[in-house]
């Protein structure tokens, strides 16, 4: 069953049609928009700083989202995909962003809209990622501008696929066993 816990009187809040895998963890001051999915072994920890997640966001397997006590918050826009085992820490990710597998985005970084953070990249504290670009490497540096077809062909495609994947669970789990949560059909 997903771990959904209040911390210091602040409880997670979920929009409509959100899927939480049976072993996902969401705690504390977390607000999640409509049509989001939080996959296996993902941790969204709003205990020391608030976390706001927009609509149509997929937080893939093994992702950790957290902040720094009394210093940072996490803000994630709409239509965002956060790849397997990425770490999102005390930063802002604007709309229509793809964060690649194993990437790390540190405190006070801002990832501009329509951007891609390559797999394994490390976005250092305070870095500003330009809108419409691909950044990669350690530390992350600009690789190139994103052509418009890559935005629809990559960023939008992945976000839309995760809506489909969550739908598979919703259809197969009319009465979800093993603790899977599909909001609002299962509370």
Listing of model-derived features with the role each one plays in the protein:
Residues 81:
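Short proline/glycine- and basic residue-enriched helix-capping loop/turn segments at helix->loop/beta transitions
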Residues 1-10, 47, 53-55, 61-64, ...:
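Glycine-rich hexapeptide-repeat left-handed beta-helix
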Residues 9, 14-68:
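A positional/architectural concept
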């Amino acid at each position: 069953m997903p771990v959904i816990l209040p911390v210091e009187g602040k409880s997670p809040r979920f929009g409509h049609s959100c899927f939480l895998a049976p072993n996902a963890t969401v705690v504390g001051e977390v607000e999640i928009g409509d049509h989001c999915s939080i996959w296996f072994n993902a941790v969204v920890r709003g205990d020391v700083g608030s976390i706001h997640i927009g609509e149509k966001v997929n937080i893939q397997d093994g992702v950790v989202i957290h902040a720094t006590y009394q210093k940072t918050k996490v803000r994630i826009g709409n239509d965002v995909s956060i790849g397997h085992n990425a770490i999102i820490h005390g930063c802002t990710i604007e709309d229509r962003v793809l964060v690649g597998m194993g990437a790390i985005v540190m405190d006070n970084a801002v990832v501009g809209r329509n951007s891609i953070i390559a797999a394994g990249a490390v976005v250092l504290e305070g870095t500003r990622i330009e809108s419409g670009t691909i950044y990669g490497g350690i530390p992350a540096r600009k690789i190139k501008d994103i052509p418009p077809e890559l935005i629809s062909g990559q960023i939008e495609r992945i976000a839309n696929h995760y809506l489909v994947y969550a739908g598979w669970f919703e259809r197969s789990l009319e009465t979800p066993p093993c603790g899977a949560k599909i909001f609002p059909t299962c509370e």
